């Protein structure tokens, strides 16, 4: 299991939202490329980037910042937010993004996931955001009637590289991830699961490591590494040595 720091982009800056609300944002850094370099310096093996403006608009919005991040670091990246079609996926992969995350598009158009996996094997990740176990889309603005487990099962056999599972009730609230829901999802599918939302202490990372055998491949942390609640270098060292 690896620890994956997040860079959430809004108007070209690194921000964190509370529970996905655009009006509840805190700016942590004006220069995303500098922030990416810092996470790489602290030992990150993968960087998670979200184009928040893109997620809400349904089309890419922070391309210049994303390009600057890719040029600034050597570690691989994964990017989500506003990616709804094959040309956008292709453009980002050509830019140097390692893996592209499909969220709302995956829920509304599973055929897109299937086609993208065929065209770009190993480079498509599905993001499933859920509130009380039900899938949320459109930048979390809309909760559907589909369960996270049922949606994830649809992608079995497509060749999806990973599923990022975010419990939006926990995201940005520093309350710890939803371990039980994450484990239930990981055990229901064969696709590796990356946990996200609420990872706010080394203890949370240890708790996720304890269910790693269920199929947990990583933990994304955002707010906690910006506020200092988690020291990224310490978290990376913890996962490398297999626990405390």
Curated annotation (Swiss-Prot):
GO CC term (a single one): cytoplasm
Highest taxon in the source lineage: Bacteria
Main location class: cytoplasm
Active site: 8, 129
InterPro entries for this protein: Aldolase_TIM, His_biosynth, HisA_bact_arch, Isoase_HisA-like, Isoase_HisA-like_bact, RibuloseP-bd_barrel
Keywords: Amino-acid biosynthesis, Cytoplasm, Histidine biosynthesis, Isomerase
Enzyme Commission number: 5.3.1.16
Record pathway: Amino-acid biosynthesis; L-histidine biosynthesis; L-histidine from 5-phospho-alpha-D-ribose 1-diphosphate: step 4/9
Compartments in which it is found: Cytoplasm
Family according to the record: Belongs to the HisA/HisF family.
Listed name of the protein: 1-(5-phosphoribosyl)-5-[(5-phosphoribosylamino)methylideneamino] imidazole-4-carboxamide isomerase
Organism this protein belongs to: Geobacter sulfurreducens (strain ATCC 51573 / DSM 12127 / PCA)
């Amino acid at each position: 299991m690896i620890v994956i720091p997040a860079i959430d982009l809004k108007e070209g800056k690194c921000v964190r939202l509370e529970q996905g609300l655009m009006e509840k944002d805190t700016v942590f850094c004006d220069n995303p490329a500098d922030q990416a370099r810092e996470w790489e310096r602290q030992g990150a093996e993968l960087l998670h980037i979200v184009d928040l403006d893109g997620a809400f608009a349904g089309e890419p919005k922070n391309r210049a910042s994303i390009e600057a991040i890719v040029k600034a670091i050597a570690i691989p990246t994964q990017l989500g937010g506003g990616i709804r079609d094959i040309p956008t996926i292709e453009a980002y992969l050509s830019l140097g993004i390692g893996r592209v995350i499909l969220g709302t598009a995956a829920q509304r158009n599973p055929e897109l996931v299937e086609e993208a996996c065929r065209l770009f094997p190993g480079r498509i990740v599905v993001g499933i955001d859920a509130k009380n176990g039900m899938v949320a889309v459109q930048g979390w603005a809309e909760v559907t009637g589909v369960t996270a487990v049922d949606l994830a099962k649809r992608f079995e056999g497509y060749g999806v590289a990973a599923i990022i599972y975010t419990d939006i009730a926990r995201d940005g609230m520093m309350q710890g991830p939803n371990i039980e829901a994450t484990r239930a999802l990981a055990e229901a599918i064969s696709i590796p699961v990356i946990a996200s939302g609420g990872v706010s202490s080394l203890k949370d990372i240890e708790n996720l490591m304890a269910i790693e055998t269920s199929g947990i491949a990583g933990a994304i942390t955002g707010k906690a590494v910006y506020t200092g609640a988690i020291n990224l270098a310490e978290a990376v060292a913890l996962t490398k040595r297999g626990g405390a």
